[in-house]
Amino acid sequence: MSTNFVPVPPQAAPQGGPAYPAPQGAPAYPAPQGAPAYAAPQNGQAMPIVQLQSVSKLYGQGDAQVRALVDVTVGFGAGEFTAIMGPSGSGKSTMMHILAGLDAPTSGRVYVEGTDITALNDTALTKLRRDRIGFVFQSFNLVPTLDARANILLPMRLAGATPDPAWFDMIVASLGIGDRLGHRPSEMSGGQQQRVAVARALMSRPAVIVADEPTGNLDSRSTGEVMELLRRAVDELGQSVIMVTHDTRTAAYADRVLVCRDGQVVSDLRDVTADSLAASLR
């Protein structure tokens, strides 16, 4: 199977939401040599890169026990953008933490690229998270004393891995941050900082990027820019993205939206707009 991906133009802002501009001067690129090959979707469904099987998560005991997740079985497609939504206490954040290996289920199994991460010891799980899962957080989590270049490369340096210069240049050009590489976080806008965080997540070519409210601290313009970048990472680089959000406008950028309520997935939606999604959440 070819490892090159056919670039797809960035999709327009979702219907019912503001017209978010794409970053200026961000060209489309094929995936570099050595990038993972992704299976083509079957019957409109992408092959799963992450799977939860009969996953439950309980906190506390007795009358104080909380059932955060209840027997959840769901797969996340390779090369697909999935958004997870739901009210506070619905289980969406717990699901994200468990599928990313940040928390363990009370029962059930979690698979990343076919590996049962619930069976891994702490050392192996830490390595898998470092090598195969990219994280993008609401608070950016950049090191304030390092410039953008050093922040992007930091996880690979800590892992003792050698960065691929061509891949680095490709990501930087695609995200439009080439003129900010020498700047520290305090010298960048929120949108620029989040672009650096996305570049850091992409640098190791992870199996999946997990984004936790990635636009929660951004204004509307920066929100649109970051969502276009995540969308392009899927369309142009074959990246898999799983995002937790409360915002229907950002969720509408996804290929698929899971709606959680009372610890269960109650809706599995495709081809949504911001307006139709808002209506389904009422």
Q: Where would I find each of the regions flagged by the language model?
A:
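ABC family nucleotide-binding domain
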Residues: 47-265
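Generic cytosolic/nucleocytoplasmic N-terminal low-complexity/intrinsically disordered segments
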Residues: 3, 23, 32, 42, ...
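Conserved beta-strand-loop-alpha-helix hinge in the C-terminal portion
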Residues: 264-282
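Long, intrinsically disordered low-complexity tandem-repeat segments
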Residues: 19-38
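Primarily ABC-family ATPase nucleotide-binding module
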Residues: 37-49
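N-terminal acidic, proline/glycine-rich, low-complexity intrinsically disordered segments
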Residues: 1-11
